[in-house]
């Protein structure tokens, strides 16, 4: 990362339901694989902390696991979190807020809930399939406001 001025995100605890099949396995010392990977991410990024207090080595931490989000923020206090799973996968804004510190430190990803917003109960009566872009925009604004309320307020 340092040599090329780039960043990287490492899969730590992903949002998919089957993530636990591997990431929740216990090591001999009793820690889980995701905890060990988090410790590695933290150590790899120690010497790569930038101007805003975060490392260029980031971690993917799923919104669908709020207990782990909080735990992983403690293990990786200077790591940017890429947080998938908000919306269609069931991740909630109040859970995602646990991955932020002072309103920063995370990038929230939502895909299906934006791409298919025109089909959702919230927007299907207002936007047609041809207006999917408008529905996507409306949902993105709604999500932004919901996240800001939990993260910043």
Identify the role of each PLM range:
Residues 2-6, 27-31, 78-81, 100-103, ...:
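Short, low-complexity, polar/charged sequence segments that are solvent-exposed and flexible
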Residues 1-2, 42-46, 70-76, 144, ...:
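Surface-exposed amphipathic alpha-helices with a cationic face
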Residues 1-58:
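Conserved anion-binding
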């Amino acid at each position: 990362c340092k040599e090329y001025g780039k960043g990287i995100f490492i899969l730590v605890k992903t949002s998919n339901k089957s993530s636990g099949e591997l990431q929740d396995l216990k090591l001999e010392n009793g820690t889980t694989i995701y905890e060990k990977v988090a410790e590695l991410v933290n150590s790899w990024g120690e010497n790569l902390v930038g101007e805003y207090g975060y490392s260029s080595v980031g971690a993917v931490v799923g919104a669908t696991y709020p207990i782990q989000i909080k735990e992983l923020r403690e293990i990786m206090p200077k790591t940017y979190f890429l947080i998938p799973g908000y919306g269609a996968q069931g991740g909630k804004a109040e859970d995602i807020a646990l991955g932020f510190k002072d309103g920063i430190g995370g990038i929230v990803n939502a895909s299906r809930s934006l791409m298919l917003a025109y089909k959702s109960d919230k927007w299907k009566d207002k936007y047609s399939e041809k207006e999917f872009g408008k529905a996507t925009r409306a949902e993105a604004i709604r999500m932004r406001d919901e996240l800001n309320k939990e993260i910043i307020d």
